[in-house]
């Protein structure tokens, strides 16, 4: 019997949830995704200090003001890591724009264009890049503009069907619903000790998005993310993409128990689902009605924003040291 890792690959594309190139090459996955939290962890590791310093030197040479220099450096760090990761996976890498822009459509568009152009300028293949955009209304609008300009987007921090439908309407390439963070909210909100896989609210949310997309032949791909357990991963076997941490990937490789496909287009087509029409006002109202999605979206933006600020502080200190050496 083959491993659960190999069995899952029959139905789903497996994605490494790490920004560490050295770790990625050991995982055997097709794609990789990063976020500010993962990049911060990598940037703090001694083995990547030369990459960090190169990005800082490059940013300084662009002759911008202090704010522009930080922007240049942060995006260069991402691109450096992304290009290194792509040496070890055959598919795509997802790079994320600054979470502090989450409610500014035009700023997100401009930042994503800069990131994409920098990626290509440094030798990257644009077809192998997904730009991660937060699942706010403004973010989804930005993704729609970017897709029309040939920049593929991964709309992230998806916590309910409303966000997923809005992203599909915007014709984005891919959405990333967060299984584990949904699960965490329900545990915290209701004091439950846990949910069976059959009742897991995070698993159910992704399954609902999958069913809606496949029922109506929506081409936007689904990349389930933020898994807490191997059982959550297996419960979504058949989802287009599964973003899995290195720890859970290793568990899947060691287990040879049979895996059953849980999601399929054929089964989704049989479901009695009605299409939903969304305007901005309807989107905002339905998000307001969903306390979990509203709170987790806001929390996710805060976490990514906070980690970006920590990374900025580290970069600022490096820049100060370089300036002192050159004085």
From Swiss-Prot:
InterPro entries: Aldolase_TIM (IPR013785), TAL/FSA (IPR001585), Transaldolase_1 (IPR004730), Transaldolase_AS (IPR018225). The keyword Transmembrane helix does not apply. It comes from the Bacteria. Keywords: Cytoplasm, Pentose shunt, Schiff base, Transferase. One of its GO terms (biological process) is carbohydrate metabolic process. It catalyses: D-sedoheptulose 7-phosphate + D-glyceraldehyde 3-phosphate = D-erythrose 4-phosphate + beta-D-fructose 6-phosphate. GO terms for molecular function: transaldolase activity. Its EC number is 2.2.1.2. GO terms for cellular component: cytoplasm. Pathway: Carbohydrate degradation; pentose phosphate pathway; D-glyceraldehyde 3-phosphate and beta-D-fructose 6-phosphate from D-ribose 5-phosphate and D-xylulose 5-phosphate (non-oxidative stage): step 2/3. It is found in: Cytoplasm. Pfam families: TAL_FSA. It is an enzyme of class 2 (transferase). The active site is at 132 (schiff-base intermediate with substrate). The keyword NAD does not apply. Belongs to the transaldolase family. Type 1 subfamily. Homodimer. Transaldolase is important for the balance of metabolites in the pentose-phosphate pathway. This is Transaldolase. It comes from Chlamydia trachomatis serovar A (strain ATCC VR-571B / DSM 19440 / HAR-13).
């Amino acid at each position: 019997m083959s491993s659960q890792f190999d069995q899952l690959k029959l139905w789903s594309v497996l994605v490494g949830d790490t920004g560490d190139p050295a770790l990625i090459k050991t995982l055997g996955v097709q794609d990789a995704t990063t976020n500010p939290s993962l990049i911060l962890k990598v940037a703090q590791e001694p083995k990547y200090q030369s990459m960090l310093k190169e990005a800082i030197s490059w940013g300084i040479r662009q002759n911008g003001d202090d704010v522009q220099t930080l922007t240049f450096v942060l995006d260069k760090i991402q691109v450096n890591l992304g290009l290194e990761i792509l040496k070890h996976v055959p598919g795509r890498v997802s790079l994320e724009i600054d979470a502090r822009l989450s409610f500014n459509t035009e700023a997100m568009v401009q930042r994503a264009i800069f990131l994409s152009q920098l990626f290509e300028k440094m030798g990257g293949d644009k077809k192998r890049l997904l730009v991660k955009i937060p699942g706010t209304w403004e973010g989804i609008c930005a993704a729609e503009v970017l897709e029309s300009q040939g920049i593929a987007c991964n709309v992230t921090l998806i916590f309910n069907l409303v966000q997923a439908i809005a992203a599909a309407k915007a014709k984005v390439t891919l959405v990333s619903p967060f299984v584990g963070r949904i699960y965490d909210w329900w545990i915290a909100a209701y004091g439950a000790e846990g949910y069976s896989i059959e009742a897991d609210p995070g698993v159910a949310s992704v399954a609902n998005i999958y069913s809606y997309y496949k029922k109506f032949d929506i081409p936007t791909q689904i990349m389930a993310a933020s898994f807490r357990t191997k059982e959550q991963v297996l419960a979504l076997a058949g989802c287009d993409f599964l973003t899995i941490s290195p720890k859970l990937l290793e568990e899947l490789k060691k287990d040879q128990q049979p895996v059953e496909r849980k999601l399929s287009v054929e089964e989704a087509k049989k479901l009695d689902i009605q299409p939903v029409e969304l305007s901005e006002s309807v989107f905002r109202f339905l998000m307001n009605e969903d306390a979990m999605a509203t709170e987790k979206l806001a929390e996710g933006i805060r976490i990514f924003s906070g980690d970006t600020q920590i990374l900025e502080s580290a970069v600022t200190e490096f820049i100060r040291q370089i300036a002192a050496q050159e004085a």
